[in-house]
């Protein structure tokens, strides 16, 4: 191998390592909060520290790569097409969840439902951005689209562990949102799908299947096995 080819190969590997390290650091910051900080009485500043640092890293990474908000999927571009592609699986999943709720007589409004619903739009958009606008885009730099989609969905499910029903639901949702984002990247459309599905899960899934939406170590503290 010639010197230029060796240098090019080394640069490629370094770039891949940087992309992978960025994804791992963001995922670890989320897991740190879920497993080491959130279950215990810590200050708000300490609790928000890792996510804030992760957000700064993501924004800096976008700046270094000259990625714009429009490029990431914030904006009107592809919105109609993405929403159309997501409509089928989203409505099908909603119908299935409501059917399960009807059959099991579990349709209900949980405590603080409307308050939680008011917070959901911003929360699901942040999740979609972290999952697709950042993690998927970084993995996509050195992986085949299908590989990147599956791994991204797996990471999204991982941060919802050990809540098994949520792990399954988020993995399936991550696959659908990832496939659509690969074709027509629009975060607002995927956030709408995420919002509708989350609201349906809250009112339709039986409590004996999904007793709460808690994740991480707090889930183990609040649920006996």
Residue ranges and their predicted role:
Residues 1-68, 202-225:
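N-terminal, membrane-interfacial amphipathic/helix-forming hydrophobic leader that caps
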Residues 52-55, 59-112:
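"…centered on the first transmembrane helix and the immediately adjacent amphipathic helix/loop
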Residues 54, 97-98, 102, 106-158:
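Function-critical hydrophobic alpha-helical transmembrane segments in multi-pass membrane proteins
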Residues 26-35, 91-100, 153-162, 196-206:
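Aromatic-anchored segments of alpha-helical transmembrane domains
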Residues 33-35, 167-223:
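Functionally important transmembrane alpha-helices
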Residues 48-51, 87, 91, 117, ...:
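Residue-level signature of the transmembrane alpha-helical core
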Residues 82, 134, 148-149, 187-191:
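Alpha-helical transmembrane segments and their helix-entry boundary regions
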Residues 40-49, 108-113, 164-171:
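Short, aromatic-rich membrane-interface segments at the entry and exit
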């Amino acid at each position: 191998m010639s010197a230029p080819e060796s240098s090019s190969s080394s640069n490629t590997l370094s770039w891949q390592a940087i992309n992978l390290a960025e994804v791992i650091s963001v995922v670890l910051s989320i897991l740190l909060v879920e497993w080491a900080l959130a279950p215990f009485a810590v200050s708000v500043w300490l609790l928000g520290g890792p996510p804030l640092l992760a957000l700064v890293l993501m924004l800096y990474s976008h700046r270094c790569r000259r990625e714009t908000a429009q490029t990431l999927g914030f904006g009107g571009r592809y919105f109609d097409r993405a929403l159309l592609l997501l409509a089928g699986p989203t409505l099908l999943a909603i119908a299935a969840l409501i059917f399960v709720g009807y059959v099991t007589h579990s349709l209900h409004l949980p405590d603080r439902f409307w308050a939680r619903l008011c917070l959901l739009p911003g929360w699901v958009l942040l999740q979609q951005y972290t999952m697709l606008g950042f993690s998927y885009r970084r993995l996509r730099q050195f992986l085949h689209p299908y590989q990147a989609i599956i791994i991204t969905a797996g990471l999204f499910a991982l941060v919802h562990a050990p809540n098994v029903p949520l792990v399954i639901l988020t993995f399936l949702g991550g696959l659908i949102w990832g496939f659509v984002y690969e074709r027509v990247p629009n975060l607002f459309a995927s956030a709408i799908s995420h919002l509708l599905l989350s609201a349906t899960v809250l009112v339709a899934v039986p409590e004996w299947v999904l007793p709460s939406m808690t994740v991480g170590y707090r889930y183990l503290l609040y649920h006996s096995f």
